[in-house]
């Protein structure tokens, strides 16, 4: 089966112009984002899920590919119901009929990893049942193993930066493993519910824990209006602008306060019921560490005040250097970005677009930003799209900046630690007391000539190498010229041993000079710098 699947993958990738991933000789001319999406669709559920995961990672793929892979749909035919029944029994040692009062055999949703059914518990509660496709875990692991082997044996160098193969496959293994274990999603639901229990306008479904396993989730069914069904919302008397503000504040709380946010907030996962915003589907969640939250706060303030140095400081502190970083170039790029936004009204600034530009600037300057920010970028893009639809006049930046400013004020008092203050104060006083002696020591070193200045050069190896080559050729040419002149003088005076009354030393000098000249000419021609 693995051999057959390998042949199928190679055939489809080559047909759509991506054979170079397997063999550099198969570099077709049909390579495009659209063709990559078509190839993934043809290769089935595993590759659809891979494409969906990759669409959340702009740090791994160029933006045109991200946009195209985001179009991948989960329109996968449902599984045979007998297979669903067998999996249910294997997981819970009980039949569907014995567990539920009613169970709809036709799924209301059929995705690449799982399908969802309506059901009613014995106690009358309406629930939805998410059941993993039988054998999908093994299929996905097999496909990923095949891809990993292909990338290991190929000699392709990915010079067009389409994808970082090793990192992409590692990320895919992690992401698919997490999504295939439904316990992770159950924990996500509980954590999200706990963090938002004090938010009066947010509602999260509860789970039926005794019926949940690694492959099955049974949770409360929330019947509501899709957030983009504007006509129905207006008929029900909802204020769309108020809904937009509530959604914005809810999202900012998740990001800047909780550090745990919904990673897939498209309209299908946002329902409105009884003045509550109801979040569903917690398979994809984003997390942000405490230090990264603080850096994000600083970045937003840098945008608000057009503080280039502060933004550079944030980028350098959270990013990982992948090569030489030219701070002057970085400064100019950020300054140019801010200058473009100075004349733009805050309401017209899109956070997602600015994030994309900061990602690109960082990448151009050999800085890799944390992967946590890629999920934030995608979810922010979705939230902006939803808000633009339900409340076009609302600018999330107008809400964001005051929110972050107030959070920073509260953060100072909330995180105030008297012990740390004393410790840092002691360190400051200790360092300050050493300053006079250090200054005197430095002054004496300068006066007595012991001071040393260390200079570090960057990227000068090639110019130095070229200079050495040039000097060597000049020396070589001078030696050849000297030998020609010397040999001419010897022949003119005709001194030394002779052959046919011609000086052997003079002739030998000319021959050696000719060989050296020929060697010099060949080396110049090979270098292509004639």
Curated annotation (Swiss-Prot):
One Pfam family recorded for the sequence: ABC1
Name the UniProt record assigns to this protein: Uncharacterized protein in hydrogenase 1 5'region
InterPro entries, per database record: ABC1_dom, Kinase-like_dom_sf, UbiB_kinase
Signal peptide interval: none
Protein origin, superkingdom: Bacteria
UniProt lineage: Bacteria, Bacillati, Bacillota, Clostridia, Eubacteriales
Protein family according to the UniProt entry: Belongs to the protein kinase superfamily. ADCK protein kinase family.
């Amino acid at each position: 089966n693995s051999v057959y699947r390998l042949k199928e993958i190679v055939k489809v990738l080559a047909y759509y112009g991506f054979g170079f991933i397997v063999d550099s000789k198969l570099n077709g001319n049909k390579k495009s984002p659209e063709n990559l999406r078509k190839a993934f669709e043809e290769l089935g559920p595993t590759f659809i899920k891979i494409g969906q995961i990759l669409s959340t990672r702009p740090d791994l793929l160029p933006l045109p590919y991200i946009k195209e892979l985001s179009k991948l749909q989960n329109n996968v035919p449902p599984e045979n119901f007998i297979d669903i029944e067998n999996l249910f029994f294997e997981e819970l040692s009980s039949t569907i009929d014995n567990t539920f009062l009613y169970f709809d055999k036709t799924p209301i949703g059929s995705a690449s990893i799982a399908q969802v059914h309506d059901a009613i518990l014995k106690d009358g509660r309406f629930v939805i049942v998410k059941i993993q496709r039988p054998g999908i875990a093994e299929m996905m692991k097999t496909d990923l193993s095949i891809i990993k082997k292909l990338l290991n044996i190929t000699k392709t160098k990915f010079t067009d930066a389409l994808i970082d193969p090793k990192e992409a496959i590692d990320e895919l293994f992690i992401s698919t493993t997490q999504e295939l274990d439904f316990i992770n999603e159950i924990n996500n639901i509980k954590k999200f519910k706990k963090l938002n229990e004090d938010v009066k306008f947010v509602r999260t479904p509860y789970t039926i824990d005794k019926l949940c396993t690694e492959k099955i989730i049974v949770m409360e069914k929330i019947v509501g209006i899709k957030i983009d069904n504007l006509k129905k919302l207006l008929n029900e008397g909802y204020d769309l602008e108020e809904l937009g503000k509530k959604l914005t504040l809810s999202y900012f709380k998740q990001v800047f306060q909780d550090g745990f946010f919904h990673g897939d907030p498209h309209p299908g996962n946002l329902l409105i019921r009884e003045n509550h915003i109801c979040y569903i589907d917690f398979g994809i969640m984003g997390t942000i560490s405490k230090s990264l939250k603080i850096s994000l706060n600083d970045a937003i303030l840098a945008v608000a005040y057009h503080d280039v140095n502060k933004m550079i400081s944030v980028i350098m502190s959270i990013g990982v250097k992948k090569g030489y970083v030219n701070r002057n170039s970085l400064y100019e790029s950020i300054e140019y970005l801010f200058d473009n936004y100075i004349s733009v009204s805050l309401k017209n600034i899109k956070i997602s677009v600015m994030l994309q530009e900061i990602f690109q600037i960082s990448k151009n300057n050999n800085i890799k930003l944390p992967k946590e920010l890629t999920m934030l970028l995608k979810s922010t893009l979705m939230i902006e799209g939803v808000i633009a639809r339900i409340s076009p006049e609302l600018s999330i930046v107008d809400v964001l900046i005051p929110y972050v400013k107030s959070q920073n004020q509260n953060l100072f008092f909330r995180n105030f630690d008297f012990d740390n203050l004393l410790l840092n104060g002691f360190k400051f006083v200790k360092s300050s007391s050493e300053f006079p002696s250090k200054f005197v020591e430095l002054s004496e070193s300068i006066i007595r000539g012991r001071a040393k200045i260390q200079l570090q050069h960057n990227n000068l190896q090639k110019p130095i190498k070229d200079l050495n080559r040039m000097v060597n050729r000049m020396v070589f040419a001078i030696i050849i010229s000297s030998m020609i002149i010397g040999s001419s003088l010897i022949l003119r005076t005709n001194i030394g041993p002779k052959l046919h009354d011609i000086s052997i030393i003079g002739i030998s000098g000319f021959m050696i000079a000719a060989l050296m000249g020929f060697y010099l000419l060949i080396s110049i021609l090979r270098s292509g710098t004639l």
